[in-house]
Structures are given as C-alpha cells and as structure tokens.
Amino acid sequence: MSNLIEVVDLCKTYGAGDTRVDVLRGVNLAVAEGETIALVGASGAGKSTLLHLMGTLDRPSSGSVLFGGEDVFRKSDMDLAAFRNRSIGFVFQFHHLLPEFTAEENVMMPALIGGMKRSAALGPARELLSEVGLAHRLTHKPGELSGGEQQRVAIARALVLSPRLLLADEPTGNLDMKTSDEVHETLSEINRKRGLTLVVVTHNERLASRMGRTVRLVDGRIEV
C-alpha cells in the first residue's frame, strides 16, 4: 500500500533565545493510503502541532510534508489554501458550525467557498448528512442540535469535497461517553465505506483503540 502522506525530519520552533520552545524535534512519520492512526501523548507533547502541519494549517521551521510524494510546502500560500480545501478535511474539538445556517448549509460551505454552485453542492451535502445519521436534521440550525449531532454535521462538512485525508483534533473532547462512542463509530464507518485516511489526536483510549495504529509523541519526538 502506497503512502499518502510522509512527514520528514519535521521541526517546529516558536520564539527565539530565552523564549525559544522546540515543539517538534525531527519527527518522521509515514501514513499509508486508507490507514487510521491515533496520535497520543501528554499535553504539550506536540500532537496538535504535528496535526496542523500535516494539514498545512501552519508551516514548519524545517523538514517537509509530502502528500502523494509532493512537498506541499513548496506551494505558495494561495495554492496551499486551494490544495488544503480540496484534499484535506478537518474536525476539531469544537464544531465551529455557523449558527445562522442550517445543517445542510453548513455542510455545503466548503464546496461553495471552492466555487461550486449551490445546486451542485446540495445533493452531496444531504447524502453525507444521511450517511452520518442526520437525514432528519437537514434544515435544523446548530442551536437545535445536540452536541453529538453538531459534531456529526462537522464530520459531514469535512467530507463534502471528498478529501483523501481526514484530520481530527480531539473530536470527542467535549462529549460524554455515550455520545463519544457514537462519533467514534461514525468515524470508523466512514473509513470502512470510503477508504479514507484518518489521523486523530486524542486522549480517549477507546477512540485510540479503534484506530489501526497508535503513534505516541513524547517531548516533540515519536516514541519508538
């Protein structure tokens, strides 16, 4: 199985001199197409920083991220933003849904930003909401949904442009155990159905156990 994403000698430093903080220190990681990985470790170990760099939300201090063999950080900021919107889906601890829009409108948003017409985006949005068990909530606004439903809308939104990679940063951190399990099952089912590559930062051992591989970070390095 070929690698979808490769992290090569990745370093990330903030500040300088006495305020310098080395968050990532030469991280190497290969993720195969369709693989599921849990990134675990203590707070401050660099998990979210690594996820953000894999998702091109930030640029590294040194090292590279190869996506399908291409060094993505050779792209301009504009090209990188277009690549990110097209190729990578994100789910965060807080759903970041737009409160004035319905579930289906929130799911359509990345497609509309990418230039797709509303008429073309509506069908995929409804199909995804059905896939995550929310066919009966299409026209409900975020304030009318439970926490688990809001997070499932966020998952559907992350998938609307059919990305090859889904990155999730503590996706169940704000949810109770029962609701967390429902979201875990949604993520697992999406991987099974779509063959989507999934990398999850989590402190939740139950979620980590559902992933095909667990990678532990300690002080900015991958524990071997």
UniProtKB/Swiss-Prot annotation:
Q: What's the protein name?
A: Lipoprotein-releasing system ATP-binding protein LolD
Which residues does the UniProt record annotate as the domain ABC transporter? 5-224
Residues binding ATP: G41, A42, S43, G44, A45, G46, K47, S48
Complexes and interactors:
The complex is composed of two ATP-binding proteins (LolD) and two transmembrane proteins (LolC and LolE).
Membrane topology designation = Peripheral membrane protein
Picking any one GO biological process from the record gives: transmembrane transport
Species name: Geobacter sulfurreducens (strain ATCC 51573 / DSM 12127 / PCA)
| GO MF | ATP binding; ATP hydrolysis activity; transmembrane transporter activity
Q: Which keywords are on file for this protein?
A: ATP-binding, Cell inner membrane, Cell membrane, Membrane, Nucleotide-binding, Translocase, Transport
InterPro entries this protein is in? Answer: AAA+_ATPase, ABC_transporter-like_ATP-bd, ABC_transporter-like_CS, ABC_transpr_LolD-like, MacB-like_ATP-bd, P-loop_NTPase
